[in-house]
Amino acid sequence: RPPRSTLFPYTTLFRSNAKKAIVVKFRKNDANGWEDGQTGNYTGTGYLNKKFVHPAFQNGPVHYPYPVIRMAEMYLNLAEILIELDALENTTGRLEEAKGLIDKIRVRAGIPTIDEAWKKANHPEKANTAEGLREIVRRERQIEFYLENQRFWDLRRWKDAGILGEKVWGMNIEGDTDETFFVPTELQNIRTFKQAQYLMPIPMTETNKVPHIVQNPGY
């Protein structure tokens, strides 16, 4: 496993990683009906988001520019295209070009390149196949675009959104010490994902205009 986890403290807040005390109010899955209303001064998973949270945040609105598209996205988009083209046509050079693009992101983050990291992995050959690089670039997208509204669409176009119906794990928020807090704990919420959710429903206002439009399955 590459050491990308070293970036975790910079994007996520957790016990022993806090820099200052701020009292905030939380809501826990109120939109899903699991527990409506405020839940007090705690987080259900033991984690808090740190990325995009302004250092001056004090429970009031803070305005600052939000990137619509970043250079990192263009690099990873092109890398993904090259990997899929190689899988279809099995040509030379595309995988190396894709790795070079991904490495731009990794080097900027201060972590080893793909080849350097996977030399120490259990399956070093993974970085030299289209199938292996596909998994690598998808993982890079998940980490690089954390909370940037990419994951929702990525999982659907990859047809991997079924993982959204799997169990969710967090820390033991009732733990009083590091030993009892840092224990993987299954959250008591039920998530489901249906095949129909790969497509959006066509608004009734549109189907009423054109009766011949066939509604997407499941809606």
Give the predicted meaning of each segment.
Residues 1, 9-219:
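Acidic/polar-rich alpha-helix caps and helix-coil junctions
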Residues 5:
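Extracellular glycan-interaction surfaces
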